A protein has these predicted regions:
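Start-transfer (signal-anchor) and selected internal transmembrane alpha helices
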Residues: 1-24, 111, 201-210
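Short helix- or helix-capping micro-motifs
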Residues: 120-131, 170-174
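Specific aromatic-rich, kink-prone transmembrane helix
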Residues: 105-108, 129, 143-170, 186-188
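Juxtamembrane segments of multi-pass membrane glycosylation machinery
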Residues: 51, 70, 74-95
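Short acidic/glycine- and proline-prone juxtamembrane loop motifs at membrane-interface regions
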Residues: 135-144
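Extracytosolic helix-loop segments that constitute the early lumenal/periplasmic catalytic or substrate-binding loops
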Residues: 23-26, 41-67, 74
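Transmembrane-helix motifs of polytopic, lipid-linked glycan transferases
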Residues: 89-114, 153
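Membrane-lumen/periplasm interface segments of specific transmembrane helices
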Residues: 24, 38, 48, 55, ...
Length: 234
């Protein structure tokens, strides 16, 4: 009870937005207002992964090409066991939880770097009302949205010198989709500039940026063409 009382404002704000996000995302799905692309395709893929079947794109293509030949998205594999609990709502629920977790990450980041008690709450609310979130929720599910919500926690890990944690978070973001790896590359470049006076952090971030770029290039040049029926990316 003490923990709840201590964080009552952030819990209340987050609960209100969980309700709002659910009214958009889950209600749309309940009334059959969600789409075959991407939610239908991805839910089908997650269901197949949960049953140890390699998911394909036969739902949208004439050939039985593995879905990994489109986007190299490993979140569908990671989240697939949850389909036994939540069925076709799985990815929508995961996305909502990710958004709330991302908001809390932003709150914590501003709480750590600043000394004004009100700023973290403003940052939290700003994130929750950001228009891009509602565009994503109204068009079902996106793995890159889930990955984006990890970014604040990545910032916190770098700020607090939690290098092992930062590597784990980086890997989790990279496996969302190949294009997000390029986004992470530029994030790390920005952090290199931010921490340019800290040699240890700079070297660590340079390594992470190179890992991100290498992952992006390997996936688009080698892995996706391997799974693609056209043997090329895109």
């Amino acid at each position: 009870m003490g923990l709840i009382k201590k964080h009552k404002y952030i819990i209340t704000i987050s609960f209100l937005f969980v309700t709002l996000y659910s009214l958009i995302s889950l209600v749309n799905h309940y009334f059959f207002r969600t789409y075959a692309l991407d939610l239908g395709l991805y839910t089908n893929a997650a269901f197949k992964y949960a049953h140890f079947i390699l998911a394909d794109s036969s739902m949208i293509k004439g050939c039985h090409e593995p879905i990994l030949g489109g986007h190299f998205d490993l979140y569908l594999v990671i989240f697939s066991p949850l389909t036994y609990l939540f069925g076709t709502y799985t990815l929508l629920i995961v996305q909502i939880i990710a958004l709330i977790t991302g908001g809390i990450g932003i709150f914590r980041y501003f709480q750590i770097i600043g000394n004004k008690k009100s700023i973290p709450y403003y940052a939290l609310i700003y994130f929750y009302i950001f228009f891009g979130i509602y565009g994503a929720l109204s068009f079902d599910y996106h793995s890159v949205v889930v990955a984006s919500c990890v970014v604040p926690w990545f910032f916190i890990s770098i700020y607090r010198n939690k290098m092992v944690v930062s590597v784990l978070l980086l890997v989790f973001m990279l496996v969302s989709q190949e294009n997000f790896a390029l986004f992470v590359f530029f994030i790390t470049l920005g952090l290199i500039i931010e921490y340019r006076k800290n040699q240890k952090k700079s070297y660590h971030l340079i390594l992470l940026s190179l890992i991100s770029l290498a992952y992006f290039l390997i996936v688009i040049l080698c892995i996706i063409p391997y799974f693609s029926s056209q043997s090329e990316y895109g």
